[in-house]
């Protein structure tokens, strides 16, 4: 925690301000100092977890909206670890986790968004999506697997589908 307390890590540069237009190219992808993950976890997690618990209580009490948190990253980037270390501290009755891997036979028998819609959280609850419907577009476009995917025809030959 010493590095964090001395200000050797500037977490503000990783934050998105409310109503600010986001340009992901401007965000750094590497940390600027060598800091132990445990130090960061011990320094920030207790406060963040308490804030998340409070937000979850408010979301549940208002029962107006459901919240989706999408974790989109490459394999082994820490999506499962994030679910286990961050969201495991919330009330499990109000949190669901859906992992979107290759579509199952049942999912292929339905329209493109069926499996996503099926996983949406009810009002007052939080749904954590391990990957998203973008995965089907991103992976097939990047790895040239369109012929094996179940993409809508409007995306198959569109040059700006990933934009």
Language-model features: where?
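Pre-Walker A (Motif I) flank of P-loop NTPase domains
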Residues: 64-68
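Conserved small/polar residues in nucleotide/adenosyl-binding loops
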Residues: 157-163
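Pre-Walker A adenine-sensing motif
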Residues: 54-60
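Short beta-strand-centered segment that lines the nucleotide-binding/catalytic pocket of NTP-utilizing
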Residues: 94-103
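Glycine-rich phosphate-binding P-loop
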Residues: 71-86
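Conserved catalytic network of the ASCE P-loop NTPase/AAA+ motor domain
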Residues: 61-62, 90-92, 118-122
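Charged, amphipathic alpha-helical linker segments immediately N-terminal to NTP-binding catalytic cores
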Residues: 4-46
């Amino acid at each position: 925690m010493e590095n964090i307390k001395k200000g050797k890590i500037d977490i503000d540069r990783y934050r998105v301000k409310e109503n600010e237009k986001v340009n992901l190219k401007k965000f750094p992808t590497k940390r600027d100092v060598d800091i132990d993950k445990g130090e960061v976890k011990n320094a920030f997690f207790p406060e963040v977890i308490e804030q998340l618990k409070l937000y979850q209580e408010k979301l549940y009490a208002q029962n107006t909206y459901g919240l989706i948190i999408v974790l989109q990253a490459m394999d082994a980037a820490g999506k499962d670890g994030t679910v286990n270390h961050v969201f495991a501290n919330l009330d499990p009755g109000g949190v669901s986790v859906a992992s979107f891997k290759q579509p199952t036979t049942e999912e292929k028998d339905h329209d493109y968004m069926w499996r996503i819609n099926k996983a949406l959280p009810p009002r007052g609850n939080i749904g954590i999506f391990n990957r998203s419907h973008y995965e089907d577009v991103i992976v097939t476009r990047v790895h040239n697997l369109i012929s094996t995917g179940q993409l809508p025809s409007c995306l198959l030959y569109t040059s700006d589908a990933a934009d």
